[in-house]
């Protein structure tokens, strides 16, 4: 179903395809002074793109097929988008369909990780926390499972999307979601140290810099961007986060029409620390693959030592709102 082509050391494999479709293969040039390791020595990651609906079991079936395909192709880690579990028609349905982390649905994904022998980034689970009974609000929770199906990290989205975009309609995530209170330290995985974030978080460079400072080599932004902000901001933001943090950026995305009133932009992608898009999905559900070259990342940081040139003495009020 998917073919690979051996590339010169300064180029990366870029693949993207829809299920039952011919793959798209391309190469991306790198700065001549920076070399890569032999491609077959590098860990392979898979970025999954889906169209979630309110039907949780149908969504699981779709995600499971993509994860199984990723494992068959040799990926060590598969990334699923925000709201991989479901996208409801309204806030009331969202709350009704939500589950705790120890619920049945996450148990199915744990079993899937075990059976496939693959790590899973579950990019935005509608979590009923321990305070559910008190406030009837959920968390938007990014869960990381290892290949044994164990939860090794969970991050609750800290920046909630309360916006009004002309042509896209209002979004009030805080009406039914509580913000998380902390960042999760980067997690060591077979692909590198992964920093967890979710969708709207990508608009806050402070978060990406904080995760990079804490040791992240890969930043992941599972998302469900809309049809207006997607074309305007999606790729620009992801490339900016990669360049400023000198990390790989992996963004699994929702795509297509979820129900009568909701659609997502798609265009899942992987960006390297130079800011090059090294893999992207085609239109519709499917996955793309990329190899993570940490030697190239270290070279980037050596040749452009921006973290050594930072002036924190000048940035004291950076996290404050505009006056």
UniProtKB/Swiss-Prot annotation:
Its EC number is 3.5.1.128. Residues 1-33 form a transit peptide. Expressed in most tissues with higher expression in adult liver and kidney as well as in fetal adrenal gland and skeletal muscle. It catalyses: N-(4-oxoglutaryl)-L-cysteinylglycine + H2O = L-cysteinylglycine + 2-oxoglutarate; N-(4-carboxy-4-oxobutanoyl)-L-ethylglycylglycine + H2O = N-(2-aminobutanoyl)glycine + 2-oxoglutarate. InterPro entries: C-N_Hydrolase, C-N_Hydrolase_sf, Nit1/2_C-N_Hydrolase, UPF0012_CS. Belongs to the carbon-nitrogen hydrolase superfamily. NIT1/NIT2 family. Catalyzes the hydrolysis of the amide bond in N-(4-oxoglutarate)-L-cysteinylglycine (deaminated glutathione), a metabolite repair reaction to dispose of the harmful deaminated glutathione. Possesses amidase activity toward deaminated ophthalmate in vitro. Plays a role in cell growth and apoptosis: loss of expression promotes cell growth, resistance to DNA damage stress and increased incidence to NMBA-induced tumors. Has tumor suppressor properties that enhances the apoptotic responsiveness in cancer cells; this effect is additive to the tumor suppressor activity of FHIT. This is Deaminated glutathione amidase. It comes from Mus musculus (Mouse).
């Amino acid at each position: 179903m998917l073919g690979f082509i051996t590339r010169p050391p300064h180029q990366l494999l870029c693949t993207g395809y829809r299920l039952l479709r011919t793959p798209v293969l391309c190469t991306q040039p790198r700065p001549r002074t920076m070399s890569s390791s032999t491609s077959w020595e590098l860990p392979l990651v898979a970025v999954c793109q889906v169209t979630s609906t309110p039907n949780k079991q149908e969504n699981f079936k779709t995600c499971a097929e993509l994860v199984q395909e990723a494992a068959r192709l040799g990926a060590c880690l598969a990334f699923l988008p925000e709201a991989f579990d479901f996208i409801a028609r309204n806030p009331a349905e969202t709350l009704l369909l939500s589950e705790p982390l120890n619920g049945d649905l996450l148990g199915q994904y744990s079993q899937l990780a075990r059976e496939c022998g693959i790590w899973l980034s579950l990019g935005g689970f509608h979590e009923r926390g321990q305070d559910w009974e008190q406030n009837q609000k959920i968390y938007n929770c990014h869960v990381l499972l290892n290949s044994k199906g164990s939860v090794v990290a969970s991050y609750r989205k800290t920046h909630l999307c309360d916006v009004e975009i002309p042509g896209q309609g209002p979004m009030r995530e805080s009406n039914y979601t509580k913000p998380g209170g902390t960042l999760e330290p980067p997690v060591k995985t077979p692909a590198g140290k992964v920093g967890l974030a979710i969708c709207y978080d990508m608009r806050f460079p402070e978060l990406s810099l904080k995760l990079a400072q804490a040791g992240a080599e890969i930043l992941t932004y599972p998302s469900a961007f809309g049809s207006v902000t997607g074309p305007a901001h999606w790729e620009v933001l992801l490339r900016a986060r990669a360049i400023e943090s000198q990390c790989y950026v992996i963004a699994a995305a929702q795509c297509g029409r979820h129900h009568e009133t909701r659609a997502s932009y798609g265009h899942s992608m992987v960006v390297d620390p130079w800011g090059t898009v090294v893999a992207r999905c085609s239109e519709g559900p499917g996955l793309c693959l990329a190899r993570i070259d940490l030697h190239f990342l270290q070279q980037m940081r050596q040749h452009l030592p921006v973290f050594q040139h930072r002036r924190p003495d000048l940035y004291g009020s950076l996290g404050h709102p505009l006056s």
